[in-house]
Amino acid sequence: MIMSRSAIIEKLQNEQMKKDITPFRIGDTVRVHIRIIEGDKERTQVFAGTVIARKGQGLSETFSVHRVAYGEGMERVFMLHSPRIAKIEVIKEGDVRRSKLYYLRGTSGKASKVKARLGARRSSNAVTKQIVSAE
């Protein structure tokens, strides 16, 4: 069976894509655990902030996380399927009406807050349903 070049590339990309990615949206506050290798040592560094953008699709999908530390705005772009990302934790789910939150770059203090989504935390909601159905 002869496969086309694009079919071969797609197959290779699907093999390299992570399957266990935590679902998150724009506006969510996340904690990204990154593996850092220095010589023969490996450690995990945590970067927490608000997701302000998601771009691309497939293996080349990226997301940007913005945070303010010591009065300075910091932004970092991560490859979603990178082997360097150990895990992504969703701390708080945000309710926004934009697909890109670049306006947060120039804000500080209360102006940089994102409204919390009502009825959020899907995982805790599932636990509540199990408790209610058990009674």
UniProtKB/Swiss-Prot annotation:
Looking up PROSITE patterns in the UniProt record yields: RIBOSOMAL_L19 (PS01015)
Q: Which InterPro entries match?
A: Ribosomal_bL19 (IPR001857), Ribosomal_bL19_CS (IPR018257), Ribosomal_bL19_sf (IPR038657), Translation_prot_SH3-like_sf (IPR008991)
- Keyword entries, A-Z: Ribonucleoprotein, Ribosomal protein
One Gene Ontology CC term in the entry: cytosolic large ribosomal subunit
Extract the GO molecular function terms from the UniProt entry: structural constituent of ribosome
Sorted alphabetically, the Gene Ontology BP terms of this entry are: translation
Chain's role = This protein is located at the 30S-50S ribosomal subunit interface and may play a role in the structure and function of the aminoacyl-tRNA binding site.
- What does the similarity note say? Belongs to the bacterial ribosomal protein bL19 family.
**Name of the protein in question:** Large ribosomal subunit protein bL19
Q: Which organism is it from?
A: Protochlamydia amoebophila (strain UWE25)
Give the lineage: Bacteria, Pseudomonadati, Chlamydiota, Chlamydiia, Parachlamydiales
The gene for this chain is rplS
